Amino acid sequence: MTKPFKGVIKLDVRDSKPDWTPYELKKAPAGAPNVLIVLYDDTGLASWSPFGGRINMPTLQKLADSGLMYSQWHTTALCSPSRSTFLTGRNHNVNRCASIMEATDGFPGAAGRLPAECATIGQVLQDNGYSTFWLGKNHNVPTEDTASGASKSEWPLQKGFDRFYGFIGGETNNWYPTLVEDNRYVDQPSTPEQGYHLSKDLADQALRMLRDQQSANPSKPWFMWFCPGANHAPHHSPKAYADKYRGKFDDGYEAYREWVLPRMIEKGLFPSDTALTPINPMPKAVADTVPGDAVRPWNSLNDDEKKLFSRMAEVYAGFSEYTDAQVGRIIEYLEQTRQLENTLIFYCAD
């Protein structure tokens, strides 16, 4: 509702008094913190080193050592619903996001379009004096709206974000991604032969946005939603990072479970009497109805299969650590510009 005019209008401008207050944008409170959320994809609690896992995460470890590590964390185990709840603070069914965007069905809880009453954190903060940035994955646009000529009503700039750079959908090629900047598709800035990787590109763009913010309006707080392609398939890691894990997973996935559980108990993440679930928790009669829906015992694999699955784990781990290094560049910039102490950082996965 428009605020009433409180100025004075006389016959002569010299006797009149303007009133700009109805048009002033709301400012954030003095000292309001910046907020950075780093949201990985498809990553289990037992993967990362701060939680006892084998994947080295120096940036996350640094933040965990000086912060708080949560042991209670709920996701829907699907991209779109989890991200909708994070963006709005509301149940995913209330958000009409019961499943991924490719599975919307037109029913009230799964229509894929956010109700107007479900404001995003971007909209709330934007209306209260924040700059808002979204980088990386956006799996909250209905499939029929992903084309360049389709409706943009569910795209980030229409959901409270000043800037967006990333991709729309569940996954993309990290060497040759389908990129979107704001409301348009764009070409990637370089090739893999020139050193391109999506995780690095996202960090580059995040730093560019933050530098622009600092030069244009350094007193204005910002919110950044940083969602890399990691660790969702396709798993694309620079070879040097994948090779750091050569042989680290040769003992197999069953042995890894046995190895990591005591470490997680020691860190206080699980009660001391926690036992492993069966590697195939579903009854065999049920699992057999869905081809590939059961894990084969490691010792039943032949040598080529073991070699393949070990390498897949190495690439996954390298992908994760490489992306963590890119997040580290953002943290380093915040340290250099003395913003870190006034920045809330959440480092998590769906």
Model-derived regions, located:
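Formylglycine-dependent sulfatase
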Residues: 1-350
